[in-house]
Amino acid sequence: MALLKMSSILTAKEPPEKEEDKRLMVKCYFYLLSSGISQLNKNGHEEIHEWAKKSPDRVYAWAVNDEPTVSAYIRVKAGKTRAGRGTYKRALPFFTMRFDSLDSALGILMGTADMLEFTKGGQLIMDGAPEFGAQIGAYMMMVGDYAQ
């Protein structure tokens, strides 16, 4: 039953109405993105593997303000990647893509909002250098393309 619900949530074209469904949907997207980028690296995706090979030990994260259970991360170190759920606890992430609300996160994750406009408006906060936000954003799009 849980897998069926997750499947229907991830294939939805409109954001859900109920707050608990929004929370679940954003969590599923965050887990899909972190795991997807890691799996593309492990399976030899040329662009992502090159990026991971050159990377020092860094953590990239996704989070929503005031939603401590809605977060995920990917650790990248010398060609290896590891996706994780929740907040990375050993150190502050090198870069965090943080959203001001579940609705803002869904706007970006479902492709109905503009990343630059949301950044200007404060709905998307990039903790770290913006060029890394663009890079992670491009990898998010790759995972999204494969997922569809």
Predicted segment positions?
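Feature captures hydrophobic
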Residues: M1-Q148
